[in-house]
A protein has these predicted regions:
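Exported/extracytosolic protein signature
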Residues: 1-166
Length: 166
């Protein structure tokens, strides 16, 4: 299966019959895992997801998320969860494929911690919240691919992202 800890993460592939492209809805369920890899307890006060071209946010599928703009959403679901060193927590977001006969290929969803806090007001020593800087440990991606079927349909709906805090 697909694991958030894989780096790089495998691409989840969905192949569609050409005749069914305009009749199908594809929803990708992403699990965003936050882990405290630091030495002090802390909070991930807000998480931000950067929606890739080809996917869209549907508010009815995601009542605990707020849309900032067409390609950015946030949630504060983890704001009151004190993560001790080594602790993890997860949230989910569902993104929907934009149904279009030209919308194929790899779509790379990114999520990061956009606000964090600890009782010592100590900054994260190896990343900066809310800077959308790939390569830091508070941001991760999960690629998906939609294509035209050449064989049997495979459907995967759960994809992991690992976001690390403190």
């Amino acid at each position: 299966g697909h694991k958030a800890e894989d780096d790089p993460e495998d691409v989840v592939k969905v192949d569609l019959k050409k005749s069914k492209i305009n009749k199908v809805t594809i929803k990708f369920r992403y699990k965003i895992r936050v882990k405290n890899e630091g030495n002090i307890a802390g909070y991930a006060k807000e998480l931000k997801d950067y929606i890739p071209n080809g996917l869209k946010f549907v508010p009815e599928d995601n009542p605990l998320w707020k849309q900032i703009d067409e390609k950015t959403i946030t949630t504060d679901q983890t704001k009151d969860i004190l993560l001790q060193p080594g602790d993890t927590t997860e949230v989910e977001v569902v993104l929907t494929w934009i149904n279009d006969s030209e919308n194929f290929g790899v779509m790379d969803n990114w999520a990061e911690i956009s606000k964090d806090h600890n009782d010592f007001n100590s900054p994260d020593i190896d990343s900066t919240p809310d800077n959308n800087k790939k390569g830091e440990d508070d941001i991760d991606d999960a690629p998906v691919s939609v294509g035209v079927q050449t064989g049997q349909i495979k459907t995967f709906t759960t994809i992991g992202l690992a976001v690390l805090v403190i």
